Amino acid sequence: MEATLDGTELRVLGSLVEKDLTTPEYYPLSLNALVNACNQKSNRDPVLSLDESQVTRALDTLRFKQYALVSGSGGRVAKYRHALVEKFRFSPAELAILCELMLRGPQTVGELRGRGERMHKFSDLSEVESVLADLAERTPSLVAKLPLQPGRKEPRYCQLFSGEPDLSELAAQMEARGAGADGEKIARLEQELSELREEVASLRETIAEFRKSFE
């Protein structure tokens, strides 16, 4: 890409696209609404905590790179919107796929179809694959297919607005997420085991008292 985006710029741009497609009645966005969109916990990976100054700096860069526009002057509240349709002539399906990749990182075809449904209704997986192929064939390419990870059946795709992917970093992130999920599962099982032990102890006490009543 001629204008590579950093993580904050990518989150801001993805949030603008998402709100354009999901809540057009509230779009373009004020700065406050955009900050909230960037920091929301649903449909985000990772969840961020950006402040207004960070979002403003990202907006300035996106405007300079012609990825975003601002409207409102003369005392009116400034509103921000993305300029991807004007710049790249994206279809709604392409916008939905790119938005998901910007907001959640690399994903499989199935994940993109399921998660992208809120922005564009895909007829089937082949439509998603077709959109990904079109984006990959652009000059320069806008998405890339990642090598299949060990133990996984489906490859994932990533966006290239933030540059070529660092495969070693992506692998480390996936391992960390897997370890975190395993840790949460172990903690949950330990909690359930502790609760079961308490229930068994309580039941034994009840049985002992019941037997005493017949002695």
Swiss-Prot record:
Protein name in UniProt = UPF0502 protein Gbem_0102
Upper classification of the source organism reads: Bacteria, Pseudomonadati, Thermodesulfobacteriota, Desulfuromonadia, Geobacterales
Give the source's domain of life in one word.
Answer: Bacteria
As for family, the record states: Belongs to the UPF0502 family.
- Identify the PANTHER family for this entry: UPF0502 PROTEIN YCEH (PTHR38768:SF1)
* InterPro entries listed in its UniProt record: DUF480 (IPR007432), WH-like_DNA-bd_sf (IPR036388), WH_DNA-bd_sf (IPR036390)
